[in-house]
């Protein structure tokens, strides 16, 4: 558990991000998924996109909390993950056809996973980091792609795959942060929080 005097609000409903925070002993006091427009600006770089969206999520959550006195001292954490081949963004697929197209694109080549994290401190400071990971997929057969789509594990995930599931077997090589690909880079997140006075290690006590 975190320090009882400190509260962290996670501006996300992602179970993967919540699990990753639990991994380093952090229990968010509140989850606040923010419904924002995630459409890229024309010619926007994937790195810029994830940075912008993570900030928008964090700021939207903080704005929603302003009217609640009990949350005026909360830290707010926003995060957004973007998958790209070069500068081509591979978004969250809504339909099986989109998922199939994404997996065919990623098959046998390298892609980048960018995650932007944004922390809004109790005094309103905004701090940001972006993590980058290079991932290479093996060449996928049509049968593998069809079976993966049938599993449903692509739903709601950037790039139409989740590395922590079946798709972990597709990864030939990974350079950088694994937790970044899952959805929240833990090194960067811990660095951001501790750098702004949030007691990360208070949740590490046995029992």
UniProtKB/Swiss-Prot annotation:
The keyword ATP-binding does not apply. It catalyses: dTTP + H2O = dTMP + diphosphate + H(+); UTP + H2O = UMP + diphosphate + H(+). The record marks 16, 81, 164 as: Important for substrate specificity. CDD domains: Maf. It is found in: Cytoplasm. The active site is at 80 (proton acceptor). Gene3D superfamilies: 3.90.950.10. Pfam families: Maf. Its cofactor is a divalent metal cation. Keywords: Cytoplasm, Hydrolase, Nucleotide metabolism. One of its GO terms (cellular component) is cytoplasm. Its EC number is 3.6.1.9. Its main location: cytoplasm. GO terms for molecular function: dTTP diphosphatase activity; UTP diphosphatase activity. InterPro entries: ITPase-like_fam, Maf-like. GO terms for biological process: nucleotide metabolic process. Belongs to the Maf family. YhdE subfamily. Nucleoside triphosphate pyrophosphatase that hydrolyzes dTTP and UTP. May have a dual role in cell division arrest and in preventing the incorporation of modified nucleotides into cellular nucleic acids. This is dTTP/UTP pyrophosphatase. It comes from Agrobacterium fabrum (strain C58 / ATCC 33970).
């Amino acid at each position: 558990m975190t320090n009882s005097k400190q509260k962290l609000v996670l501006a996300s409903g992602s179970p993967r991000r919540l699990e990753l925070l639990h991994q380093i002993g952090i229990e968010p006091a509140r989850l606040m998924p923010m419904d924002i427009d995630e459409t890229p600006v024309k010619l926007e770089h994937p790195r810029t996109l994830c940075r912008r969206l993570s900030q928008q999520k964090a700021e939207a959550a903080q704005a929603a909390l302003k009217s609640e006195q009990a949350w005026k001292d909360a830290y707010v954490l926003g995060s957004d993950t973007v998958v790209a081949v070069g500068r081509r963004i591979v978004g969250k697929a809504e339909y099986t056809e989109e998922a199939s197209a994404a997996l065919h694109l990623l098959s046998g080549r390298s892609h980048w996973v960018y995650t932007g994290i944004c922390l809004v401190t109790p005094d309103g400071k905004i701090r940001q980091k972006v993590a980058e990971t290079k991932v290479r997929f093996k060449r996928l057969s049509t049968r593998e792609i069809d079976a993966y789509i049938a599993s449903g594990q692509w739903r709601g995930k950037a790039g139409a795959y989740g590395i922590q599931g079946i798709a972990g077997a597709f990864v030939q090589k990974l350079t950088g942060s694994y937790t970044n690909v899952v959805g929240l880079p833990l090194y960067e997140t811990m660095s951001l929080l501790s750098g702004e006075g949030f007691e990360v290690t208070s949740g590490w006590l046995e029992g």
